[in-house]
Amino acid sequence: IQDEFLVQPASRAGLVNGAQRRLNEAIGWIGYTGAIVAREIMPGGQTGAYGHSVAAQGGHIQPGSYSGHFGDAQQARFIAETAILLFKNEAVEGDIVAQANIWAGYANRVLGENWCEAVIDGGPLEDGLVYLKRAEGQFSEAINRASTDSLRTAAYAGRPQVRAFL
């Protein structure tokens, strides 16, 4: 889909909702995998499709494993940040920009809390805290742009979580 179509009023919500969906996918898998490793849920033949390795069930995450979770979170970040950029270039106003910043902020927060290193859009390898710094700015932007209490509350909830981690 070409960018010119993504910024049309009828497409904006779909773009933002796409970021939300990918983030929901990432959070679900990160939570599930973390619960297995922490023994918050007990394995019961969960190997193979949608399962976890015996090593993970025993509490060990192999380096380089579970890249799908990372991919989901990166896609959420990329989609939301692309929306922010496209909306800025088209001078889109209103709560849709606040929503894009909220989902970008939460995607960056998830990345910063779960991965020690960061690569943003093919750039250099950086400290994972870069995700949290980006999230802080995105939450602040959402607070400034939001016209509803629910959006401001979502941004106000995310920003101190990021600041506490930093």
Regions found by a protein language model. Give the residues of each.
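Membrane-proximal, proline-rich intrinsically disordered regions
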Residues: 1-38
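Conserved, well-structured interaction surfaces
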Residues: 13, 49-118, 127, 141-149
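N-terminal carbohydrate-binding/catalytic regions of secreted carbohydrate-active enzymes
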Residues: 26-52, 65-70
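Flexible, glycine-rich active-site loops centered on histidine and acidic residues
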Residues: 120-122
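Aromatic- and glycine-enriched pocket-lining scaffold segments that form the walls
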Residues: 150-166
